[in-house]
Structures are given as structure tokens and as C-alpha cells.
Amino acid sequence: MEYCKNFYQIKSNSEIFERIKAERKEVGYYNLPYQDTAEIKDYAQSISKKHIVVLGIGGSSLGARAVYEFLLPSNDYNKDLLFLVISKSGNTIETISIFKYLNSLVEIDSSNCTIISEAGSILTRLANDNNIKAFDLAENVGGRFSVFSVVGLVPLAMVGVDIDNLLNGCK
């Protein structure tokens, strides 16, 4: 393998190309723009709450917030809330702590809560045990790419963003 003075590879290397092709199959974010969004849109349409509270840290909340603030800013707040609890692992201490605290202030149940987490996580089990809507987050999608997964698409669809159009922009 040859490199120029700036460490750019001069010759093509089939091994590197094959690794990139293999990564495309293993890493989930490459396929996010092509996912089926029917369930997310149907669910978003069924929500009658006027406001949504997203509980999450890092990629579990920042991507959706950034897109929302850019596209649909609003300051109209009241108590007609839906708690959207997001944690990839389902046991993120900050998210769980906030969830428990809020549950001590207001009864959180299937009428005002949705959970997004990996299948089989503590949060997903809580959702299943309490008839709370849950979306499974793919294990192979990392936080920084999660805005184009259910982590970002569910809250964005709920506030009226055309998520199919958003995903088309990723293609």
C-alpha cells in the first residue's frame, strides 16, 4: 500500500473496499433511509396528546430535538402530555431516574407513555407488562445515527414532520 505525503492512499486496496462493503451489511445506519415507516406514521396519527416529553440522553433525544427545533418551533405548553421514554439499552441511569421521578409526580401508564428501546430491555419489558406502546430499536444502530431510526422518527412524526421526505433526503 502506498501513501502520499499527506497520508492519503495512492493505490486502491481491495481489502479496504471489501471491509467497507462488509460494514455496510453489519452497521444499521446505512439502511435507515430505506426503512418502512408505516407503523410509526400510524402510531403518530393515533396520538391525541398535544405535547410530548422525550426522556433520553445523547442520541436518544438530541437528534429529534434538533430537527424539531429547526422545523417546528413552539412554546405552547400544557399538561396534555405524552412521555416518550427513549434509551437504547433500556437501563440508562439518567433516563430511568427521570422516568421514576416523573412517575412519582404523575401516573405514567399506557395513556400517556411510549417507550423506545432495544427488544428485551428493562424498559421494553416494563412496556409489555403494562400495555404501553413500545418501539424496538435495532441493536446495530449507534446513538449518533439514531435520529433516522425510531429514536428520531417517532417523535418527529408525532409533531407532524414528513418522515418519509426526511428519509428521502438521506438517500
Model-predicted regions and their roles:
Residues 1-45:
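Extended, charge-enriched "interface" segments that sit outside catalytic cores
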Residues 45-171:
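Glycine-rich phosphate-binding loops that contact phosphosugars or nucleotide phosphates
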